[in-house]
Amino acid sequence: MRIVIKNGIVIDGFGGEEKADILINYGIIKGIDKNIDVSDAIVIDAEGKYVLPGFVDMHTHLRQPGFEEKETIRTGTESAAAGGFTTVACMPNTNPPIDSEVVVEYVKAVAQREGVVKVLPIGAMTKGMKGEEITEMAKLKKAGVVALSDDGFPIMSAGIMKRVMTYGKMYDLLMITHCEDKTLSGEGVMNSGIIATMLGLKGIPREAEEVMLARNIILAKATGAKLHIAHVSTKGSVELIRRAKEEGVSITAEVTPHHLTRTDEAVYNYDTNTKVFPPLRTREDVEALIEGLKDGTIDAIATDHAPHTKDDKKVPYDMAPFGISGLETAFSVINTFLIQTGIITMKALVNYMSMNPARILGISNGIRVGATADIVIVNPHEEYTVDKEKFKSKGKNTPYHGMKLKGVVEYTIVEGQIRYQKNKKFEKVEI
């Protein structure tokens, strides 16, 4: 399949930004120039639109195997394509967890057969994600995991976590940590503060995140492991990460679109779609997260896409599961609240959502001749109203339902194949 993308504003991920055409032939970018004309090619007119390296999500929950009522690899990757993501890294909190090479191979096989975008498995740090016995990391790496994490089941034992990092360093595996001291978070369901008190809901204090983050930084410094901090949510965490980077610790961090744009005030109406972990914090925290993103303390924007069924969320707030379905609104949310307001540029977004996540995960990305054609075309000016019922994901749990957002994904191209086109039903063609 040959594709020519014409007249778009190309941000290549390497510092370049220009109006140009792109020629794609059999999955590879063959030309970037003015006025490319070839016969027998699909022509995409990108006039007035941005042509960007495909987004890479470091933190996606695809739920398969074990929780297919919430999401499958098929529906999750369809959702990813609709959001402009060409690659997603899937968390190991499945049933069974991704803690053995057998489960890794299963995920890869299903992704190859049914996936719409590229899927990178993340392996568990401990068997069953129980925080007791470390997994066989050499076998997991050989099977194809790109990182290790126990996701929402943080390892409470510092001794075991140090062993995990020591072996992770040995096998050159990225350590992705969900920083939570469960003795501090307890049964909390939202940010600890005046709003939680007013609503009669149990709070989760900042210290629950910051204490565990501080411990993990100390262990990473001691072992030399590559540490990545998932879904940073507090001002104190930003300060800890900034200091760690200044001290030379091998540390990177991510923040979600919802933590960058929403506060605990969103919980006022007890909408369970605002229940997420870590919880939505205060305006002061949001401002610190944005500043951390801008100054390089935080490296990436990741969705923490956590789909749930409608019945899961149709319960009292304190009984509902944590999680937001975030793949399909990520670009629009960042574009609306950060780009259109002048806080960051589209070129910066490419770093946060395309290039830095790829670099951290150890994969290639970017638009240049000879590169794999993983590309997203976006219209930053088109406004739409979020309708959760139109999501490709099984998870309709979004706090943005009914909200007007600016910025839509027009096309998602994965290895030279059109995997998503706005307003067109998708039919998978083998890559």
Swiss-Prot record:
Native organism: Caldanaerobacter subterraneus subsp. tengcongensis (strain DSM 15242 / JCM 11007 / NBRC 100824 / MB4) (Thermoanaerobacter tengcongensis)
Positions of substrate binding: 61-63, 93, 308, 322-323
SUPFAM superfamilies per UniProt: Composite domain of metallo-dependent hydrolases (SSF51338), Metallo-dependent hydrolases (SSF51556)
Metal-binding as UniProt keyword: yes
Active-site residue list: 304
Protein name per its UniProtKB record: Dihydroorotase
Top-rank taxon, per record: Bacteria
Disulfide bonds: none
Role of this protein: Catalyzes the reversible cyclization of carbamoyl aspartate to dihydroorotate.
One GO BP annotation of this record: 'de novo' UMP biosynthetic process
Keywords for this protein: Hydrolase, Metal-binding, Pyrimidine biosynthesis, Zinc
Residues annotated as binding Zn(2+) 2: 151, 178, 231
Alphabetized Gene3D superfamilies for the sequence: Metal-dependent hydrolases (3.20.20.140), Urease, subunit C, domain 1 (2.30.40.10)
Cofactor note: Binds 2 Zn(2+) ions per subunit.
Pfam families: Amidohydro_1
Pathway assignment: Pyrimidine metabolism; UMP biosynthesis via de novo pathway; (S)-dihydroorotate from bicarbonate: step 3/3
Protein's gene: pyrC
Family per similarity comment: Belongs to the metallo-dependent hydrolases superfamily. DHOase family. Class I DHOase subfamily.
